[in-house]
Structure formats: structure tokens, C-alpha cells
Amino acid sequence: MSRAEEAAKRAELAAAQERAESLKAQKLIDAFLAAAKAKGIAPQPLRATLYSGKSVKTDKVGWYLRKNQSVAVGDDGSYYVLIVPGGFRERLSGVKLQPNPPPLVVGKGGKDGETGDLAEFLQLRLEPGWAAS
């Protein structure tokens, strides 16, 4: 097997693993949606942060999962990363969020220190007194 074939095989295996992880994570999100609805925790309009640090409105509503409001779950069950590119136009008109494949570990590879299992973030969000700073 050539190096190119080996690299392609590794990439294929990694993609398959990511898909399997996302399926497991989506099941957790679906359970969260049902629990949030049962507890009467209403979704709120989501805001995103541009790379420049400016906060902008989005076209989605949902629940923030991190205190810094960098990730959220939409009321449609989608997972959103809320740090987005944009400029003056986005500051005026807002941004249209695109869903991301949900990970089982939130913030993996990040440097801000707020990483952990998706299940833990979802559970914390259901607890009374949770509020994004």
C-alpha cells in the first residue's frame, strides 16, 4: 500500500469515527431538548461573536452551553459554534448560523480551559440558576 493510500485510509477512518461520535452526541442533544421542554426552560435568541470580538444577532434561538456563549444548541436540535467570521455587513444585518456536527467533547483542542463532555454541559444547562455571563 502506498503512502497516499495509507493516508487516504487514515482519513476515511477518522471521518467514520467523527460521524459515529456525532451520532452519539446528537442523541444526547435530543434528550436535552426533551428535558428542557419538560422543565420549561425556554430557548432564547442566540447571538454570535465575530472574529473581531463584536457581538451580532443571529437567525436562531436556543440554549448556550458555555458561559462564554461560544457554543449553543438550537431549538431545532442543531449544534452551533458561535464564533464566526464577518464584518460591517454582519454587524448590521446579523449572521445566518450553519450547524456543526456535534462533538462528544466540547472545546476539544481549545485554549480557554472550558472543555468537557457534552453530556456534562447539557446537564449543567438544565440545572436551576444557570446563566451565561
Question: What do the predicted segments below correspond to?
Answer:
Residues S2, D30-F32, S52-K54, K60, ...:
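Generic structural signal for short, flexible, solvent-exposed coil/loop and linker residues
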Residues K39-Q44, Q69, G77, N100-L104:
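Generic structural motif recognizing short loop/turn segments at the entrances and edges of beta-strands
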Residues R47-V84:
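Amphipathic, interaction-prone secondary-structure segments
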Residues M1-T58:
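N-terminal domain-onset segments
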Residues L92-S133:
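Helix-rich interaction surfaces within compact, conserved domain-sized segments
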